[in-house]
């Protein structure tokens, strides 16, 4: 899920996505054209327009997808001449979507390294904005699997003491990045509980990194200490089946792992190599074979 403050404009985007799902790219484009005629290239229109590009990409029309990506990027940049990026919650969504679209077009054309270089340049440009995690997510999707696991900050545990990833070498680790407001995360909880029941004795460990968002229930602003207490309460009540699971409270983890989507799941093998990087929910049926494969590798040799 995306945070409530970053949710896309519901009606227009929903209609465009429905047209895409029906395979009607012309209808999706017509909806955006009509909204543009009425309102101009507003951030809302640009978010919807990015979905037209994503629909074209899914349909294999790379030229159209690329053209929409460039148009959305240019129009978002034009809006930035009159406002800050985060002055409007929809503007970073539109700009981020255009960058993501252009990178995915490059990948579809076989230019993976060029896509990574492009994403890194954009991340360098927008590193101190709300887009940074989304850009890091896209970099990770293209490059993280098969590489050593990035460090995990463990200085602020919530409840149980936090082991470092290095201390867990020899076990298979499933990182469950979650948020206190995230209903999809709560639905993921029973899946993880079932996996721990099945594979915990064989060497599976779950760690649940999270972060502060500056508010608690109902969007009420909260001081860091108050939000930490609220997060602990949500964890205790909504994830009772995962009692004893270490919880790391640190925004740096979400930034490093590109967690603009919650839940995000990262599976690490016994040697500390990432075997899965997956923004979004996964079923037990999808996760179990991956966990079994990682467990079957056996522990690394002792030195």
Say what each PLM segment does:
Residues 238-244, 248-292:
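Thiol/disulfide oxidoreductase modules built on the thioredoxin-like
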Residues 161-186, 192, 206:
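Short active-site neighborhood of thiol/selenol oxidoreductases, capturing the structured segment around
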Residues 13, 47-50, 93, 100:
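TPR/TPR-like alpha-solenoid signature
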Residues 108-155, 166-169, 300-303:
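N-proximal helix/coil linker or "cap" segments that precede and/or mark the start of modular domains
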Residues 2-5, 36-45, 76-92:
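Flexible helix-coil transition and linker loops at the boundaries of alpha-helical arrays
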Residues 187-238, 246-255:
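Structural microenvironment flanking redox-active thiols in thiol-disulfide oxidoreductases
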């Amino acid at each position: 899920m995306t945070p409530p403050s970053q949710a896309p404009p519901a009606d227009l985007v929903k209609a465009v996505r429905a047209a895409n799902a029906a395979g009607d790219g012309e209808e999706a484009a017509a909806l955006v054209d009509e909204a543009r005629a009425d309102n101009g290239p507003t951030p809302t229109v640009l978010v919807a327009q990015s979905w037209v590009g994503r629909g074209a990409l899914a349909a294999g029309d790379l030229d159209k997808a690329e053209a929409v990506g460039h148009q959305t990027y240019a129009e978002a940049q034009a809006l930035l001449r009159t406002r800050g990026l985060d002055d409007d919650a929809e503007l970073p969504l539109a700009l981020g979507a255009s960058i993501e679209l252009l990178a995915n077009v490059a990948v579809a054309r076989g230019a993976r390294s060029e896509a990574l270089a492009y994403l890194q340049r954009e991340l360098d440009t927008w590193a101190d904005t709300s887009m940074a995690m989304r850009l890091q997510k896209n970099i990770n999707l293209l490059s993280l699997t098969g590489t050593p696991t990035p460090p995990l900050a463990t200085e602020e545990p919530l409840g149980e003491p936090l082991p470092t990833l290095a201390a867990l070498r020899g076990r298979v680790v499933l990182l469950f990045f979650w948020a206190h407001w995230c209903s999809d995360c709560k639905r993921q909880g029973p899946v993880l509980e079932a996996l721990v029941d099945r594979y915990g004795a064989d060497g599976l460990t779950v760690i649940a990194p999270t972060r502060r968002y500056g508010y608690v229930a109902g969007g009420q602003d909260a001081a860091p200490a108050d939000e930490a207490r609220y997060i602990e309460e949500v964890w205790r009540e909504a994830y009772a089946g995962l009692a004893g699971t270490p919880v790391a409270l640190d925004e740096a983890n979400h930034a490093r792992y590109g967690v603009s989507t919650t839940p995000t799941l990262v599976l690490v093998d016994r040697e500390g190599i990432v075997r899965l990087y997956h923004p979004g929910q996964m079923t037990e049926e999808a996760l179990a074979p991956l966990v079994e494969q990682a467990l079957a590798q056996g522990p690394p040799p002792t030195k």
